[in-house]
């Protein structure tokens, strides 16, 4: 009787223990107010990020990096996408079978330099670090102008090099077309 009681009790404890291990859903009380609805500024880009890591410093670093990536996506994002659409039918008339396959793939790549991106807020909620960063829109415009000018100079330099090569090739061809004779009398 004691064995049955102990077995029943241990089974009951096991079932109760397993049933209570569901993760709690995240609620607004677990987040800073500004995380889901970041403030909007006319002259600044805003990005938010969060991280939950064993070490606080790593959490802060990862959350900050995620917030910066969000800003970088707002400043400059290159999106590559492809859509493959395949349709096939086999058989005769209304008895034909049809197969249709559609695949959509997209990838975004962010590569930009954020000079002057600053951390505005850092908060900790239940061991999770939340970070908000801002980036001055005027600085973003200036950086874009600098990059555009550098690209234009590089393209101009490449174009000038191309034109110089063309000129030398033209000169080489003109020399090759020259005849070997001259109107000057040859010395005997």
What role is predicted for each listed range?
Residues 1-19:
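Sec-dependent bacterial lipoprotein signal peptides
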Residues 18-188:
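Domain-level marker for long, solvent-exposed, non-transmembrane regions
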């Amino acid at each position: 009787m004691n064995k049955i009681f102990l077995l029943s009790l241990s089974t009951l404890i096991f079932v109760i223990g397993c049933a209570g291990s569901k993760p709690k859903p995240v609620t607004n009380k677990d987040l800073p107010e500004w995380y889901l609805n970041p403030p909007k500024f006319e002259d600044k880009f805003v990005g938010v990020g969060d991280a939950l890591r064993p070490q606080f410093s790593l959490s802060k670093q990862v959350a900050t990096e995620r917030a910066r990536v969000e800003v970088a996506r707002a400043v400059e994002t290159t999106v590559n996408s492809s859509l493959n659409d395949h349709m096939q039918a086999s058989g005769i008339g209304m008895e034909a079978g049809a197969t249709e396959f559609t695949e959509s793939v997209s990838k975004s790549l962010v590569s930009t330099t954020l000079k002057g991106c600053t951390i505005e807020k850092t908060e900790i909620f239940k061991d999770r670090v939340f970070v908000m960063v801002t980036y001055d829109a005027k600085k973003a415009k200036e950086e874009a102008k600098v990059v555009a000018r550098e690209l234009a100079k590089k393209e101009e330099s490449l174009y000038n090099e191309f034109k110089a090569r063309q000129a030398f090739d033209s000169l080489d061809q003109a020399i090759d077309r020259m005849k070997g004779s001259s109107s000057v009398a040859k010395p005997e």
